[in-house]
């Protein structure tokens, strides 16, 4: 997929406040500070998504219109301890409404920090998506920070841990080096049937 143009067209803070569905969309979700905005910017090949040093900054669902046909959807980060219980409930209600009511959603990319073992909140997200029959692919982020000598071991550790939930594609990526970006775009292209 060649991304010719991208524009942030909607910031949804309440359930149902989404733009009309287009030909298709993919969504990105992960723990706070997993590198979601950086990965989106790498996919877009330009700085569109706001990158913050503060975890838990994205508290809305952000819809990016890509090539005037598709949405790339940035879901709020989860697992940040300093967020109040009320905010966590609002986040859950917003994301659950999106998952249940967005028929144009083809795939969720679950971003997991490749440097460390998956966290309990990652497993909870997997179980939640499985219970809602949401298709997902696991994307390991920040792989440039994993030593080359440890990469195969880290990948195998992640594969083994995630295998208890079934067989899932795992794509190692780095928004710094560009690793995995073209593979991710190819997969998205196939999902959205872009030629």
UniProtKB/Swiss-Prot annotation:
Molecular function via GO? GTP binding; metal ion binding
Q: Which residues form a coiled coil?
A: none
Q: Which GO terms describe its cellular component?
A: cytosol
User: Per the record, a Pfam family?
Assistant: MMR_HSR1
Domain (EngB-type G) ranges? 22-194
User: Which UniProt keyword terms apply here?
Assistant: Cell cycle, Cell division, GTP-binding, Magnesium, Metal-binding, Nucleotide-binding, Septation
Asked if the keyword Cell cycle belongs to this entry, the reply reads yes
Binding-site residues, Mg(2+): 37, 58
What residues form the membrane-spanning segments? none
Q: Which PROSITE patterns does this entry report, sorted A to Z?
A: G_ENGB (PS51706)
Give the protein's cofactors. Answer: Mg(2+)
Going by the entry's taxonomy, the superkingdom of the source organism is recorded as Bacteria
What residues bind GTP, as annotated? Answer: 30-37, 56-60, 74-77, 141-144, 173-175
Provide the GO biological process annotations.
division septum assembly
User: Belongs to which family?
Assistant: Belongs to the TRAFAC class TrmE-Era-EngA-EngB-Septin-like GTPase superfamily. EngB GTPase family.
Which PANTHER family does the entry mention? ENGB-TYPE G DOMAIN-CONTAINING PROTEIN (PTHR11649:SF13), MSS1/TRME-RELATED GTP-BINDING PROTEIN (PTHR11649)
Q: Give the function comment from the record.
A: Necessary for normal cell division and for the maintenance of normal septation.
Q: What is this protein called?
A: Probable GTP-binding protein EngB
Q: Organism, per UniProt?
A: Thermotoga sp. (strain RQ2)
Q: Which gene encodes it?
A: engB
């Amino acid at each position: 997929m060649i991304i010719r143009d991208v524009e942030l067209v909607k910031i949804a803070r309440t359930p149902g406040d989404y733009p009309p569905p287009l030909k298709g969309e993919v969504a990105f979700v992960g723990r706070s500070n997993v590198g979601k905005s950086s990965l989106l910017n790498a996919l877009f090949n330009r700085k569109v998504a706001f990158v913050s040093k503060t975890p838990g900054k994205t508290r809305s669902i952000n819809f990016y219109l890509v090539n005037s046909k598709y949405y790339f959807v940035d879901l709020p980060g989860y697992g940040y301890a300093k967020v109040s219980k009320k905010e966590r409930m609002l986040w859950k209600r917003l994301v659950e409404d999106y998952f249940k009511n967005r028929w144009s959603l083809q795939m969720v990319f679950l971003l997991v920090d490749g440097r460390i073992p998956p966290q309990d909140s990652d497993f909870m997200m997997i179980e939640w998506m499985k219970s809602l029959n949401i298709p997902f692919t696991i994307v390991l982020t920040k792989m440039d920070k994993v030593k080359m000598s440890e990469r195969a071991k880290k990948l195998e550790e992640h594969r083994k841990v995630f295998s208890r939930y079934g067989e899932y594609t795992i794509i190692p990526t780095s928004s710094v080096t560009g690793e995995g970006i073209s593979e991710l775009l190819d997969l998205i292209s196939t999902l959205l049937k872009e030629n």
